[in-house]
Amino acid sequence: MKRPLEMAHDFLAEVVTQDDIVVDATMGNGHDTLFLAKLAKQVYAFDIQEQALEKTQERLNQAGLKNAQLILQGHETLDQFVTEAKAGIFNLGYLPSADKSVITQPQTTIEALEKLCSLLVKGGRIAIMIYYGHEGGDLERDAVLDFVSQLNQQEYTAAIYRTLNQVNNPPFLVMIEKLERYRHG
């Protein structure tokens, strides 16, 4: 059985091509940025911590990839850089090996999700990894689930992939796809 993050990558890899623009809304250590840079024409990656940009740039340099723009800003500013996207990924929580008090916040995450949903091309996808074992994580989890469950079913489909028998608040995946065409009825 695949872990949620593996499923997230597979979910995006099914639709992303070398012609596409994609977003890594939470750069972190750069694993998702690197993954997306191998698939897409251009990656826009966001983080508010300088350490994240440094680690990600190092990872991209080692792979010889130059198709990622690393942006030291919150993901809620993504619409200042991106006009349309085929895919996006969020890893909510905190940057491992960094200050664990610096966490993603419900209001900016929802703002970023709203913007990315509107910028998604038809057939585009968003993968949201929700880590919620830290203080404040449950509030963000609930805000994201509330937002996603209210997306118009004529325009989007959404699903959750999670383990049921794991302890200690295991992370889970929320998947959103913008439908190719509106459904009726």
Regions found by a protein language model. Give the residues of each.
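S-adenosyl-L-methionine
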Residues: M1-I21, E54-E84
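Helix-to-beta-strand junctions that scaffold the AdoMet/dcAdoMet cofactor pocket
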Residues: T17, L65, L120-K122
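Conserved SAM-binding loop of SAM-dependent methyltransferases across substrates and taxa
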Residues: N29-A40
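Conserved SAM-binding motif I beta-strand of class I
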Residues: Q42-D47
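Mobile active-site "lid"/loop adjacent to the S-adenosyl-L-methionine
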Residues: G93-E111
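Conserved beta-strand signature within the Rossmann-like core of class I S-adenosyl-L-methionine
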Residues: L119, G123-I130
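Class I S-adenosyl-L-methionine
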Residues: G137-G185
